[in-house]
UniProtKB/Swiss-Prot annotation:
Domain of life: Eukaryota
Source organism of this protein record: Rattus norvegicus
Gene that encodes it: Thtpa
Pfam families assigned: CYTH (PF01928)
Keywords annotated in UniProt: Acetylation, Cytoplasm, Hydrolase, Magnesium, Metal-binding
Protein name: Thiamine-triphosphatase
Length: 224
């Protein structure tokens, strides 16, 4: 993904007929893949508590998701996705305040920034592309991902990618429309894979995120 694009996404709980509904809507199955995601944070969860998410995806490299548009309510999220390692390192040093920045890749600065693995799991994903209202441009397509994890959790996501904040409301309308056509209840909020992983395997960290969310310090439902 190009640097600085804004992801607008909504998670949902897939049903037994979700793929059939996608086919009836004219969606195209792009691929089925299996990959491992590993998330990193400090022991104090400094990144997650500020709604920043550092992930290394097997075969794809590093990705850092930062808060995007604010002030748009509802069961959806907006993130700016950073994939350039130099840009990720710059933002990590700014957030974690660890002195003079190094010129190095992400893996090389994990120790200095006291970042450690907090979650690692395997996902099997079927990824679909769907055009609405006859739109055929690549950036007008919506992506629908259906994921199942090696710890027994399944979740779906409808995603649009835009360049500017002004484009977010229109993208959100498309996401809401597709979600409705897939039979997703209007206010459904399906938890992210990472949150469910923490709830099951690191309950103390999960509780810290919930407490911060309830106090307005973090957004527990907005895990990418």
């Amino acid at each position: 993904m190009a640097q600085g694009l804004i992801e607008v996404e909504r998670k949902f709980t897939p049903g037994p007929d979700t793929e059939e509904r996608l086919q009836k809507l004219g969606a195209t199955l792009e691929h089925r893949v299996t990959f491992r995601d590993t998330y990193y944070d400090t022991s104090e969860l400094s990144l997650m508590l500020s709604d920043h998410w550092l992930r290394q995806r097997e075969g794809s490299g590093w990705e850092f998701k930062c808060p995007g548009v604010t002030g748009v309510s509802g069961p959806h999220n907006e993130y700016v996705e950073v994939t350039s390692e130099s840009a990720i390192v710059t933002q990590l040093f700014e957030l974690l305040g660890s002195g003079e920045q190094e010129t190095a890749g992400v893996a090389a600065v994990l120790g200095r920034l006291k970042l450690q693995e907090v979650a690692s799991f395997i996902t099997t994903r079927s990824s679909w592309k769907l055009a609405l209202s006859g739109a055929h441009e690549e950036e007008s397509l919506l992506t629908v991902d259906l994921d199942s994890t090696d710890f027994g959790y399944a979740v779906g996501e409808v995603e649009a990618v835009v360049h500017e904040k002004a484009e977010v409301p229109a993208a959100l309308e498309k996401i809401i429309s597709v979600s409705s056509m897939l039979g997703v209840p209007a206010q459904e909020k399906a938890p992210a894979k990472l949150l469910v992983y923490l709830q099951r395997f690191r309950p103390q960290d999960y509780q810290r995120l919930l407490e911060a969310d309830s106090s307005g310090e973090a957004t527990g439902d907005s895990v990418p």
